[in-house]
């Protein structure tokens, strides 16, 4: 069984090679001439300036410094019908973009039905990425 688990973990790591090595703050990206991050596979991911400005308009100055991009949308092997977003500011942004602010509570983790993934990626194509998470 251990060999199978190692193979699965290797494949998941390969599938997730599009994830950033490190995320940058929205503030830092807005100050860059070419807003980009380096991915695990060595390539670069570029952010659309208008998308960065959209996010900045949703947040106060302190939150602009705290928001790390791209926002990672987690897809778990256990809860395949759900997606998860982590981080207080990240959760706030996703809720605002989806119009889920009614009765807004500050949360550090947001679980949503998986069908929201397409809507989030359509509205924020360069500032979000999805990651496959292995859970046993």
From Swiss-Prot:
Transmembrane segments: none annotated. It comes from the Archaea. It holds the Pfam family DUF61. HAMAP family: UPF0216. Belongs to the UPF0216 family. This is UPF0216 protein PH0358. It comes from Pyrococcus horikoshii (strain ATCC 700860 / DSM 12428 / JCM 9974 / NBRC 100139 / OT-3).
